[in-house]
């Protein structure tokens, strides 16, 4: 990461945290906890440095995988937002500048610029790491593979998944949550 930043002439601050020690004790969902804690540490460090935003590298493929994962594994319809205000760090905002960029375009750009990116090096992911073919154990890898298989039959699959959360008709939804409050279609049913 430091080498990539130097190549691109981008200033970078690297700092230590104790996230791994805490996450290692969570056998059920260490990746989720790690992601939440990393984000919290990024917010705190950014605020300490006088910044008002953190930028995450989620891209288009991450977004559609998250939509499908939410439906299949979380029984919910939701997405990653391209930007949002932090609920725990007042005055801070999260942005995802690569939101509309395809993963393969990022990979090609990185190779063209001779940049190297690390995959998660956490030993807790040994049994669920994402391979290039998406064959190994993680939910995200499974969903990535499913989307790839569906896209082989229908070239609009990725765009349709992405647009599905832009075209939600609340009149045809059994229930939805707004600001943490669940609403049922029965509330307005005559």
Predicted regions and their residues:
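Short, basic, helix/turn surface patches
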Residues: 36-49, 83-89, 143-164
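Charge-rich, low-complexity amphipathic helices
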Residues: 23-28, 64, 68, 76-77, ...
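The feature marks non-catalytic terminal segments
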Residues: 115-190
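Catalytic subdomain that performs nucleotidyl-dependent activation
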Residues: 61-142, 146-147
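ATP-dependent adenylation/nucleotidyltransferase module used to activate substrates
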Residues: 1-77, 81, 104-112
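A short glycine-/small-residue-rich loop at the edge of a beta-strand within enzyme catalytic domains
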Residues: 33, 55, 97, 101, ...
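Residues that form or immediately flank small-molecule/cofactor binding pockets and catalytic motifs
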Residues: 17-19, 99, 122, 166
């Amino acid at each position: 990461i430091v080498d990539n930043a130097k190549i691109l002439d981008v200033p970078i601050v690297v700092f230590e945290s104790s996230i791994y020690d805490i996450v290692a004790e969570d056998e059920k969902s260490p990746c989720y906890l790690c992601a939440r804690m990393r984000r919290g540490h990024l917010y705190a460090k950014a605020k300490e440095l006088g910044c008002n935003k953190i930028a995450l590298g989620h891209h288009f493929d991450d977004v559609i995988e998250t939509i499908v994962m939410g439906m299949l594994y979380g029984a919910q319809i939701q997405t990653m937002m391209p930007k949002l205000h932090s609920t725990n760090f007042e005055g801070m905002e999260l942005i995802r500048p690569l939101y509309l960029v395809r993963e393969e375009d990022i990979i090609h750009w990185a190779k063209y610029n001779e940049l190297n990116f690390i995959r998660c090096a956490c030993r807790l992911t040994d049994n669920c790491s994402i391979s290039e073919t998406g064959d190994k154990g993680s939910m995200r890898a499974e969903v990535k593979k499913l989307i790839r298989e569906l896209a082989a039959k229908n070239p609009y699959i990725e765009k349709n998944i992405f647009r599905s959360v832009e075209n939600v008709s609340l009149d045809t939804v059994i229930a939805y949550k707004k600001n943490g409050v669940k609403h049922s279609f029965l509330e307005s049913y005559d």
